[in-house]
């Protein structure tokens, strides 16, 4: 989500490693014709509108056009907010990796409060919408997180290069760059190993919309128990009955009925 430091990491560490920066938000901003910078709400509205009109992966397609006409062979793409954008990039590029940056809400608020003129209510509204819209063409940051190959914790405020926090973040990012480019290989850390175990547990869930795995460990990393979310024992999984999540089934059914009503009214 915004304020987590994705842009900072991309421009500070990946650009210096030879990656060319490309932002889907910048592509979206080019669709605005007003001279004043658009608000985040306006950006969200236009992004949803474009995805509804031209497909949920329209911004990713525009990014691919830019990449196809450039000579660079290494790119870092910022501001991905819809799962269809990730799916297109993975189909289009054989070595495409999703790197997510995470910071807690309070840290992110402190980073962006001046842009919001210290209006916390507006920040909370934008933050909620940015992460949890249900529409296929909406803001799906939370779902994009679930598709991440790498998650970088960026919960510290970095004042300037050379500080301990800057060096720690740089070391983490460089490590993943070297792994991606095949320069070095590393054994996974204890935390990475445990998270992989939790993820493997999540795959046991028959819920078609959200899969969550968890581990209970002690201070030394010993696993005491593991688990995952599951459909209630008395219920059948939605995908067995409806072929998809029941909520999505209802949304699609409502959308089809509404479209039919509109077309009938236009035909009269």
Regions found by a protein language model. Give the residues of each.
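Conserved lysine of the Walker
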Residues: 6
């Amino acid at each position: 989500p915004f304020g987590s430091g994705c842009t900072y990491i991309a421009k500070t560490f990946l650009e210096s490693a030879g990656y060319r920066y490309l932002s889907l938000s910048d592509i979206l901003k080019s669709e605005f014709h007003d001279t004043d910078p658009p608000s985040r709400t306006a950006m969200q509205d236009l992004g949803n509108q474009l995805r509804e009109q031209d497909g949920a992966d329209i911004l990713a397609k525009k990014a691919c056009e830019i990449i196809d006409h450039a000579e660079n062979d290494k790119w870092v793409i910022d501001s991905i907010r819809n799962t269809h954008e990730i799916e297109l990039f993975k189909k289009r590029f054989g070595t495409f990796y999703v790197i997510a940056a995470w910071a807690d809400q309070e840290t992110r608020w402190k980073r962006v409060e001046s842009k919001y003129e210290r209006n916390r209510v507006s920040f909370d509204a934008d933050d909620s919408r940015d992460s949890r819209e249900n529409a296929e063409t909406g803001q799906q940051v939370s779902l994009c997180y679930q598709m991440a190959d790498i998650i970088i914790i960026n919960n510290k405020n970095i004042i300037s290069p050379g500080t301990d926090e800057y060096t720690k973040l740089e070391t983490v990012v460089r490590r993943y760059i070297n792994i991606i480019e095949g320069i070095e290989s590393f054994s996974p850390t204890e935390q990475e190993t445990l998270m992989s175990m939790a993820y493997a547990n999540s795959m046991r869930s028959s819920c078609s919309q959200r899969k969550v795995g968890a581990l209970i460990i002690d201070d030394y990393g010993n696993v005491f128990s593991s688990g995952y979310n599951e459909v209630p024992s008395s219920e059948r999984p939605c995908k067995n009955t409806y072929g998809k999540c029941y909520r999505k089934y209802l949304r699609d059914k409502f959308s089809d009925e509404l479209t039919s009503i509109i077309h009938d009214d236009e035909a009269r």
